[in-house]
Amino acid sequence: MRNFDYSKKWEKLLTPEIVALLTQIHEYKGEQSLFIEAKADTLTQLVEIAKIQSTEASNKIEGIYTSDARLKALVKDKTTPKTRNEREIAGYRDVLNTIHESHDYISIRPNMILQLHRNLYKFEGYDIGGKYKAADNIIEEEDEQGNKFVRFRPVPAWETPEAVENLCNEFDKALGTGTIDPLLLIPMFILDFLCIHPFNDGNGRMSRLLTLLMLYRAGYIVGKYISIEHLIEKTKESYYECLQESSLNWHEEENNYVPFVQYMLGVVVAAYRDFSDRVETLVASGLSKQERVAELIKNTYGEITKSQIMEKCPDISRITVERALSELLTSESIIKIGGGRYTKYVWNRDKE
């Protein structure tokens, strides 16, 4: 049985890169906690957008899709799921909402993890949710020729309940010492959870929900306003590379947590940076939405796409962004590069 004692393992994580990321996150947390309290009403739009992006991205990583219109309707609970994909999306939506609303009351214990997994599959007709895997599972990869091979063999089914119990106990024990930064413990826990792979299905989505929950419980609430799952989905190649690197020799307890921990901390830093940028955009005083689009392009040193503008200005509709771009092109304030889906824009500094 794998040993999950974190009391010494965390010390190996204190590389210059990881320490720098920890410092940035602590600084961001200190800067933005006061703003969150003072500007809670202003951030309502970010919360709703983050829910949609989180639900879409985490399911998309696992190949679970629906149309944009159906996704938004499902996340806002304005329709009922019609397909298996939509049932899984609706389940994710509900667990995500539970974490946002009740994170203080959801401890990191096996019974709570099973409850969240049961809710993840509550719209399914078959009885899969809330149960550990009944048979051993493997993690496969496919090469460029389409040949499949085993990348990792998780903990056997018969060991899984005890492994999850031990994992939660050791995490709780390490957290209770007060000497280990939770930002180090959380990705270590998540890596071990993924190596156990406790369920027949839903392990990846559960790992991302647990990441959000644990960040919340540690006082890092950026995931309420910026989708952690969306940032992972955008960098999923790096995610899988770091996961694979950190899981090598896991069963022998000789694995290196550093790649995965560094990746996850980088995601949290990116979330805080994104949050800071969006907050500045939302509270820009005295500017119309079209003027905000212009300011964003002007302050971007290089090219920017329409989708990037919409991501930076989530409260501005596509039509308004397109109208602003059209007006800026007409006035020659910006330059259009390329065409179609590859169109980019850059500020015309010769006009200044």
PLM features: residue spans?
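FIC/Doc superfamily catalytic core
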Residues: M1-E352
